[in-house]
Structures are given as structure tokens and as C-alpha cells.
Design a protein with these regions (language model features):
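Acidic, low-complexity intrinsically disordered regions
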Residues: 1-156
Length: 156
């Protein structure tokens, strides 16, 4: 359904009740097609992920922090498959994603919601688990207003 509607992660959808119990109506917040600069996850030949700000065709309203374009869904599916049998620590995924996302702005700060959306591209993680991983790690600095910074990036 998401692909048929040309939706990306972070697209706005509306869920409405109906007269029938257990039945809901799901609709996308449609808008005229245009290209927007949004976070895009690219899958490298080595299976690594890279985030970049690229112009992508957008067909629905979206949350700027949550929206992530995924041009190579098959490559991302392969990453999910490869990771499924391994017990990868959330901490290592947080470092990897923070390292990638911090490249997208000059201060190298990463907003919690941006990180939450990026982490959920490669694993399903509830917000509280991610918040705990951020708040208990001395190598991650909270700089205010839900922004975080990797401690070693200040030494560049």
C-alpha cells in the first residue's frame, strides 16, 4: 500500500474510525508531486549505509525529521536479512547512525527524532530504549533541545 501511494518513511498518513468495529480508513496526506531536499539512505556495495541530503520526488506531506528516502529497497532488505541472525548492540548502531547523520550539518549535532528515524531504518527500536542508550553513554553529549553530539567530534 505504501509503495502504491508513493509514500516514504516519514510520510503523513491519517487513520480514521468507521462505523464498523475493527475497521479503520487509512489515507495519505496527498500533495502535488515535487522534488524536496530530504535525508536519503544509500546502500554501498560493501553493505554499509550512507546518509545524504538529496532531492527526491515527494508525493505526500511528510515530517521533515522523520522522512527518509530509500531509493534501494532491495539493498536495504538485504541488510535487514544479514543483520537478522546477529545480535548487534544498539550502542553500535547509535554510533554508526550518529556518525552518518552528524555529517549533514556543520555543528555535527543530531536531533533525537532524526536519530530515531534513522535507527528504525535498520532495526525496530522503541523511543525509550534509544533515549536510554543516549543518556547512559558518556561518549554521547546532550547539547540541549533534544540534540546530541558525539564527544570525539569536538576534537577534530
Amino acid at each position: 500500500w505504501f509503495e502504491e501511494q508513493n509514500l516514504i518513511p516519514g510520510s503523513n498518513i491519517e487513520i480514521s474510525a468507521t462505523k464498523h468495529p475493527g475497521t479503520m480508513i487509512i489515507s495519505a496526506e496527498k500533495k502535488r508531486s515535487n522534488k524536496e531536499w530530504i535525508k536519503t539512505v544509500l546502500v554501498g556495495a560493501d553493505g554499509g549505509l550512507v546518509f545524504a541530503l538529496l532531492r527526491q520526488p515527494i508525493y505526500a506531506g511528510f515530517n521533515e525529521r522523520m522522512a527518509i528516502a530509500i531509493p534501494d529497497q532491495e539493498g536495504l532488505d538485504k541488510i535487514w536479512q544479514d543483520r537478522s541472525g546477529r545480535n548487534i548492540q544498539l550502542k553500535s548502531d547509535v554510533f554508526r547512525m550518529m556518525n552518518e547523520l552528524s555529517k549533514l550539518n556543520s555543528q555535527h549535532h543530531v536531533h533525537f527524532v532524526d536519530l530515531y528515524a534513522a535507527i528504525n531504518v535498520i532495526r525496530r527500536t522503541p523511543p525509550m530504549e534509544l533515549l536510554e542508550a543516549l543518556s547512559t553513554n558518556p561518549e554521547i553529549i546532550h547539547v540541549g533541545d533534544h540534540y546530541y553530539h558525539l564527544a570525539d567530534q569536538g576534537k577534530e
